[in-house]
């Protein structure tokens, strides 16, 4: 299914009076002076959260204690352009293993970089990561600073999904012998599952789950359907939400609802709808530069139930969407008055929304609806 922006305008205009007004939400700044924070992961038992800073630091934050010093044991990262330390997630068996997973950009011998993923053990005192092991590397390394992707999601069935950008090398998203522009599926131990779609295809990378992706920035499990949802940046226009299926081609750069930043057509593009490629479940004709995303699955605030929240880097707000099966509609925006690039959005275990702003003096925000 696709929706063009002129279908959305009446909905946005009607609903933005409700959702975009500053008075619709309460905002508490929990932490400031974060240097380009990228992701957060909640720790169990009210022990706060881990926060990645793109420059390469992993920090711990806890209410009443504030922000820790940088944790030791984190891998070296290539912090250039859009690269650096990216996502952080807890292993499904964290309570027993203390294992955390990190994604980050890693440079190769020729000075070009790619996304890498690994895991280590978080110490009981939350001060260090030990025994870090890299289990996945995007190959070949092609990036000079753009389109790393890097979001990590465990699906609750024993698998880890890794969203990878095409390193600003458009045609590679269609090449099954390369890991650019792909969604990768591994086991929760970092191994390649036997039922991955291209495992028996000669010349194809066995890690690949789906392909034809430009620059994925948000990924989350839909708690109502148990399906994985993914968003990605288009070029000039064409930001998308997809529900990636096994072995499917999501089009980039052959099919896109966007154009080049120059205003001209994408050279490889054959149109918006192209045979053999999947259509997004939602797209924006004018790109908000989507980022971290979170489904609201809590009883804390009934007015937020069945909502999907997506950060917007360019539009500097949080997009509020209603979810009905595999269909979504945009209800409007929140945090528009703050004028901050939104990098990550997560639903906390307490039912509040937690937001990271992407700035040299970024903030951790706690957000709730105003009754």
From Swiss-Prot:
Any one GO MF annotation of this record: oxidoreductase activity, acting on the CH-OH group of donors, quinone or similar compound as acceptor
InterPro entries according to UniProt: 6-blade_b-propeller_TolB-like, Glc/Sorbosone_DH, Quinoprot_gluc/sorb_DH_b-prop
UniProt keyword terms in alphabetical order: Calcium, Cell outer membrane, Membrane, Metal-binding, Oxidoreductase, PQQ, Signal
Presence of keyword Membrane: yes
Binding site for Ca(2+): 240, 250
Enzyme kind, highest EC tier: oxidoreductase
Signal peptide: 1-20
Family: Belongs to the PQQ oxidoreductase GdhB family.
Protein name: Aldose sugar dehydrogenase YliI
Organism: Escherichia coli (strain K12)
